[in-house]
From Swiss-Prot:
Residues 508-520 have a biased composition (Gly residues). GO terms for cellular component: cis-Golgi network; Golgi cis cisterna; Golgi cisterna membrane. This is Golgin subfamily A member 8M. Residues 38-50 have a biased composition (Polar residues).
Length: 632
């Protein structure tokens, strides 16, 4: 298939060359006309304007024998060379397309990995929130247990006081028993004495008194046994409550240990995620650097109409993608607009930086006025590098502030957990002894830590400030792009309006035609248009990379802006000139008197046929000036 397309292209190119030479060649005898139609070559001199020198015309009239075959061979050789150049150019274009497809696939893979990492981070944040809810429930349960413990302590105090009262009553009863026994012994002694003294009728009264005393003693023994049993029950209940409290303390300590272990695992996972994100960012930066490397410029060839149409379709598609990316960036910037009161300090810093950037722009404009057109990209490269350094510094500051806030939050959470995990054993017997003398006071409820709330609120404020700063960084990058567009417009207008040979050189720099200024203008314009389209595809890829880097500037350490590298590569080659297809340049070119020249008309006609090419942004065409090769 590729060979057939190449043969078709060669046949079409030969037909066009024959038609061109049939139109522009002067009327000569039949032998000379046949030679020119078969060869389809270009005149040798650039000043003749498509006409052969008189010597050659004379040889064409008088020499038709062996010299005609030599002229045919001489005219066929450049056609064969151009066919070979066309073949090599098509192969190179296919290779470039394959590289672009592979880079797009790599970009999609990296974006897919980033999305997976974001999903994992979201899951971890959800788990963190669940843990915070569990911590709150544990705090509530701890408060409830503290209230239960307070009530238990009060009941224990009540039972202890009751047991003390019973012990006092026992002591009094024992004392009374001893007294009664002593009294009984005295009574028995007195009764024996009286029995010895008195007669038998007095013995009945004494026996009755003895029975009463025995009954009282039995009642007292029953009361003593009851008091001992109640005292033992109180002691058993106290032991059971103490064991229950010890078990609850052990459970709480185990729970706090588990929570601390889970927090440690979460910290480790967070560190691993940060490392993965750093690795992905490094891989992205490497890919961007690889994509941003400028391709070595090669001499353009004369493209066919099919290639031109294909390139125009690609340009329209790339322009549509650029418009979609710009719209997406605008939507993201609109969604990320938040409160302005919290970023006053950051706005002041950014204002200072903007003032510096404006001063740099003014100095660049002042320096660019006396200099030539080809020395201006150096100053613009310096300004773009300074802007990139400022954006990188801002992003590094944002990353450092985010890490500091996260470390502070982790420290506060660990401090809270350590305070909650402290055992309450130091408030045991002393607390009971002190409260036994004083009136019982209600147990205060455990208040929530206000420092944790302040830390969470400050962390959320910091996240919002980070989002606002990322928006401001995007705005600065968009301003830089607009400034670059304006500079391109100025350069193009300067090139179009400049009198002399530069406009001609810019128009003539696209092809390998060796025709003069009058006879070969159409072929040269076609070559310049083909070179411009090839250069636009390279620039469009770089511009797309720059927009993607601006879109991902909030998540990555540094934006990959390939525009300065492309400019640096352009400065190294030296003899570059820019051609634009924007609407403003078109309007200025219509009023320009240079459009009367045939070299500038095909470019304007191409832009009128495809107006969508200049709708998005400035599209500079870096074209080589092949005048030295023509002169050779």
């Amino acid at each position: 298939m590729a060979e057939e397309t190449q043969h078709n292209k060669l046949a079409a190119a030969k037909k066009k060359l024959k038609e061109y030479w049939q139109k522009n060649s002067p009327r000569v005898p039949a032998g000379a006309n046949r030679n020119r139609k078969t060869n389809g070559s270009i005149p040798q001199t650039a000043t003749s304007g498509g006409c052969q020198p008189p010597g050659d015309s004379a040889t064409g009239f008088h020499r038709e024998g062996p010299t005609s075959s030599a002229t045919l061979k001489d005219l066929e050789s450049p056609c064969q060379e151009r066919a070979v150049v066309l073949d090599s150019r098509s192969v190179e274009i296919s290779q470039l397309k394959n590289t672009i497809k592979s880079l797009k696939q790599q970009k999609k893979q990296v974006e897919h990995q980033l999305e997976e990492e974001k999903k994992a981070n979201n899951k971890k944040q959800k788990a963190k929130r669940v843990l915070e809810v569990q911590l709150q429930t544990l705090n509530i349960q701890k408060e409830e247990l503290n209230t239960d413990l307070y009530h238990m302590k009060r009941s224990l105090r009540y039972f202890e006081e009751k047991s003390k009262d019973l012990a006092v009553r026992l002591q009094h009863s024992l004392q009374r028993k001893g007294e009664l026994e002593s009294v009984l012994s005295d009574v028995m002694a007195t009764q024996k004495k009286k029995a010895n003294q008195l007669s038998s009728p007095s013995k009945a009264g004494t026996e009755w008194k003895l029975e009463q005393s025995m009954r009282e003693e039995a009642l007292l023994k029953v009361q003593l046994t009851q008091l001992k049993e109640s005292f033992q029950q109180v002691q058993l209940e106290r032991d059971e409550y103490s064991e229950h409290l010890k078990g609850e303390r052990a459970r709480w300590q185990q729970r706090m240990r588990k929570m601390s272990q889970e927090i440690c695992t979460l910290k480790k996972e967070k560190q691993q995620d940060m490392r993965r994100v750093e690795k992905l960012e490094r891989s992205l930066s490497k890919l961007k650097n690889q994509m941003a490397e400028p391709l070595p410029p090669e001499p353009p060839a004369v493209p066919s109409e099919v290639e031109l149409q294909h390139l125009r379709k690609e340009l329209e598609r790339v322009a549509g993608e650029l418009q979609a990316q710009v719209k997406n960036n605008q939507r993201i910037s609109l969604l990320n607009q938040r409160q302005e009161e919290r970023i006053r300090e950051q706005e002041e810093r950014l204002r200072k930086q903007e003032e510096r950037i404006q001063e740099q722009h003014k100095s660049l404009q002042q320096l660019a006025k006396p200099q030539s057109v080809f020395e201006e990209p150096n100053n613009e490269n310096k300004s773009t590098l300074q802007l990139e350094q400022q954006v990188k510094e801002l992003q590094e500051k944002l990353g450092e502030e985010h890490l500091e806030a996260a470390s502070q939050q982790n420290q506060q959470l660990t401090a809270q957990l350590s305070l909650m995990a402290l055992p309450g054993e130091g408030h045991g017997g002393e607390h009971l002894d002190s409260e036994g003398e004083e009136a019982p006071q209600p147990m205060p409820s455990v208040p929530e830590d206000p420092e944790s709330r302040e830390a969470m609120s400050s962390f959320m404020d910091h996240l919002e400030e980070k989002a606002d700063l990322s928006e401001l960084v995007k705005k600065q990058e968009l301003r830089f792009i607009q400034y670059w567009q304006e500079r391109c417009h100025q350069k193009i207008h300067h090139l179009l309006s400049e009198p002399g040979g530069r406009a001609k050189d810019a128009a003539l720099g696209g092809g390998h035609h060796q025709a003069g200024a009058q006879g070969g203008d159409e072929g040269e314009a076609a070559g310049a248009a083909a070179d411009g389209i090839a250069a636009y595809s390279n620039y469009n890829n770089g511009h797309r990379k720059f927009l993607a880097a601006a879109h991902n500037s909030a998540d990555e350490p540094g934006p990959g802006a390939p525009a300065p590298q492309e400019l640096g590569a352009a400065d190294k080659h030296g003899d570059l000139c820019e051609v634009s297809l924007t609407s403003s340049a078109q309007g200025e070119a219509r009023e320009d008197p240079l459009l009367d020249k045939p070299t500038a008309q095909p470019i304007v006609q191409d832009h009128q046929e495809h107006p969508g090419l200049g709708s998005n942004c400035c599209v500079p065409f870096f074209c080589w000036a092949w005048l030295p090769r023509r002169r050779r």
